[in-house]
């Protein structure tokens, strides 16, 4: 379906251009230091559309697409935003924020899928939403756990990098 090829290019390109502009415009001039996170996230989003996904319980799913392009993408996008804004909070608040972001973007995606099907722009099954939500959440959780480990190791002096200052 041609529309998905457009989405795979348009969404990450728009985010890669617009997000740094919006952050700089709002006083977050340090975002360029973390822009690589944004670019990796956008690359994962693009690649995810072309990865094969497994059958689950005999059902054709887009699990890999949602894990990589939904969850890992959102987790890295979140890490870029949090780092650029130098936002720090209790670990539980940070966990909730990444979960809220992946849930919101996942909901927008599912609504977009429904719209495209009902408008005749795409012919896809809409019965794998539960697997999509799980894949999005697992992908974002993977990034969040990596974030926690990296922060812990940086504080212990085992990793060189930004200590949050």
Pin down the residues of each PLM region.
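Divalent-cation-assisted or electrostatically stabilized phosphate/pyrophosphate-binding catalytic cores
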Residues: 132
């Amino acid at each position: 379906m041609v529309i998905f090829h457009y989405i795979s290019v348009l969404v990450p390109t728009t985010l890669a251009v617009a997000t740094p502009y919006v952050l700089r415009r709002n006083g977050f001039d340090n975002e360029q230091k973390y822009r690589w996170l944004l670019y990796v996230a956008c690359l994962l989003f693009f690649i995810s559309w072309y990865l094969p996904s497994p059958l689950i319980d005999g059902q054709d799913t887009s699990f890999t697409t949602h894990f990589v392009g939904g969850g890992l993408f959102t987790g890295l996008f979140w890490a870029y935003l949090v780092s650029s804004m130098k936002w720090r909070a209790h670990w539980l608040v940070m966990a909730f924020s990444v979960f809220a972001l992946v849930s919101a973007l996942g909901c927008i995606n599912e609504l977009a899928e429904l719209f495209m099907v009902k408008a005749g722009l795409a012919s896809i099954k809409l019965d794998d939403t539960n697997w999509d939500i799980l894949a999005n959440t697992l992908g974002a959780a993977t990034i969040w756990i990596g974030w926690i480990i990296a922060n812990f190791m940086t504080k212990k002096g085992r990793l060189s990098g930004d200590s949050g200052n």
